[in-house]
Structures are given as structure tokens and as C-alpha cells.
Amino acid sequence: MSGHSQFALLRQRRFLPFFAVQALGAFNDNVYRQAIIGLLFYLGIDAAQRTLYTNLAPALFILPYFLFSALAGQIAEKLEKQKLIVITTTMEIAIMSLAAVGFITENMVILLIALFCTGLQSTLFGPVKYSILPSVLKPEELTGGNGLVEMGTSISILCGMIFGGLIFQIAGSHGPEAAATAVIAIAVTGNLVARLVPRVDAGAPELKINWNPIPESRAIMRLTRRTLAVRNAVLGVSWFWFVGTVLTAQLPTYAQLNLGGQQDLYVFALALFSIGTGAGSLLCERLSGRTVEIGLVPLGAFGISAFLLDLYFARPGAAPATGLSIGQFVQQPGSVR
């Protein structure tokens, strides 16, 4: 395996269609969320209400993860995985059709309901995203394959946020129609690609699903507390996504007030964050020696915390100058840090 490269997986049907499906899903989620923000500017919503919606949107998206993750895990164990991927991408088409109605009618209530449903669809897809890899990859390919998936997710999030943020700027008065068309087209593409994913047998087809998520969630919490490695991994991964969600939600305000930048500086900062996430994902294979090394997770969580603390001390207050372009910002003292 000395000549093994994780990128070789991208040429294989057992991996590529799934990789494309999850990347398209992450891309569409972020196109949709950023297009909602674009609609707020298009409608001339005041800054206070924009801030409210900007923080409410990720909360509504994440809430289904908290409520239904245990149930989603059971469903992923019971159903054949390719079938479940097709089901969830079909759900995405229906949800984005509802979102399209919200865009065209400029109705924020419909858009927020669709956003919650998008979170629910992503919750159902999540367990498949992680459980399918051990079924289609060899043990020595798992870390590299997972790194590729995380890299693809990071790049898709970045591209989705940029594209979604530009829809209303490019389309102008046709912004609502353009946003509606985009999210439906991406969802349909994802569903078509999902049908190319090879069949993978269900993990526990005889499992009787408990539709009450509360006892299942408690059972998972008990298992997590009993197993130190699992507990550390859960805490580390949860911390990563918590920090990522908070940063991406607050980055527009931080780039403007603390960095003194224009819109392009926000996109630049977002790109650096996403590139760093993708690079770290790819490095996991080399750092772990192509084995599943769970000990890297708490180390990564510690690194996130340390660099966040340094970010605060690098610019604890308001920017000394405003309206800076990327070129002007990098010439400011301390910009490299």
C-alpha cells in the first residue's frame, strides 16, 4: 500500500457517486441559507431583523439534529443504504420546491419552515454518510476516504456560501426566481447521482425502530459516557461543528467590524477557514498512518480552542480602519496573524 493515494478513490464507482451526492447536498444547503440572507437584503430588511434571521436560520437547521439523530441512526441501520440515500435526496427535491415557493412569494415563514425541513433531511442523511464508508472501503482506505468526504464537504460549503451570496447580486430583480431555480436544479442533480451509488446491505434489517427519540437518545448518551474513546470523539467532533457553525454565522459581522473589511474580505476569510478544514481532513490519513486513529480527535479539538483564543487576542476590538479591500487588509499590522 505504499503507493496508495486517497485521491484514487475518486475514480472508483464504489466511492465517487456517494462523494458527489454528499458534496451536492452540502453545496445546496449553503446556497439556500445564503440565498435567504440575500433575499433579506433584496427586500430591504433592517439590520436588526437581518441579524435575527441570520442567527435564527442556523438554529432551525441544527434543531432536527438534536431532536432526531437517534431515530435517524436506527433508520440508517434498518434500510439498505443506497435506497435511503435516494429517499433523502427525493425529500430534498420536495423541500426545495417548498423553498422555491418561499423565494418567489418572498415569504420568510415558508423559507424558515423549509430550512427546518432541510435540517431534518440532513439529519436522516448524516448516519448514512458515515456508516456507508466502512461498507465500501477497505480498512486502510477508511481514513483517507473520510478525509476526502470532509474535504468535499468543506469545499462545497465554501462554494455554496459564495454562490448563494452572489445569486441576488448577479440576478438583480430576478433574484427570487434565480434562487428558486438554483436550489431545485441542484436537488434534482443530487437525486440523479444518488441512483448511481452501489447498493450496500442494511446493517440490521430486522431492527425494530423505536419512533420515540427520547429513550434512544438516552441510550446513546449512556454508551458515550461508558466508552472513553467514543466520548472524546463525540465531544471533539461536536466542538468542531459548534465552532464552525458559530464562526460562519458571525463571520460577516466580524469581517466588517473587527477586520474593517468589505464583502470580499468576508469571502476571503471564509475561504481560508474552509481551505484549512479541507487541508486538515486530507492530512488525517498521513498523520494516522492510514489507520483509524481516534486519538487525533481530542488533539484537534484542543487546537481549535487554542487558535480561537489567539484569534480573539489578535483583534479584540473594533478595526482601526473600515471599508478595506483584501489587498488593503493584508497590508495592515497583524493581518497575517
Would you name each region that the model predicts?
Residues M1-L16, V200-G236, L257-N258, I326-P333:
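Juxtamembrane intracellular "pre-TM" segments in multi-pass secondary transporters
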Residues L16-Q34, A57-I95, I110-Q169, A187, ...:
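Substrate-agnostic recognition of the 12-TM MFS/MFS-like secondary transporter fold
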Residues T90-E106, F302-G334:
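C-terminal ends and interior cores of transmembrane alpha-helices
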Residues Q12, A48, K78, I104-T105, ...:
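Helix-loop interface residues and adjacent transmembrane-helix termini in multi-pass membrane transporters
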Residues R50, N55, M108, L166-A187, ...:
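A membrane-interface helix-boundary motif in multi-pass transporters
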Residues A35-D46, L98-T105, L158-V183, L257-N258, ...:
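Transmembrane alpha-helix termini and helix-breaking/packing motifs in multi-pass membrane transporters
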Residues K129-S131, S135-V136, E140, P176, ...:
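Helix-loop junctions on the cytosolic side of multi-pass membrane transporters
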Residues Q34-T51, A249-L265, A269:
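Short amphipathic helix-loop junctions that connect adjacent transmembrane helices
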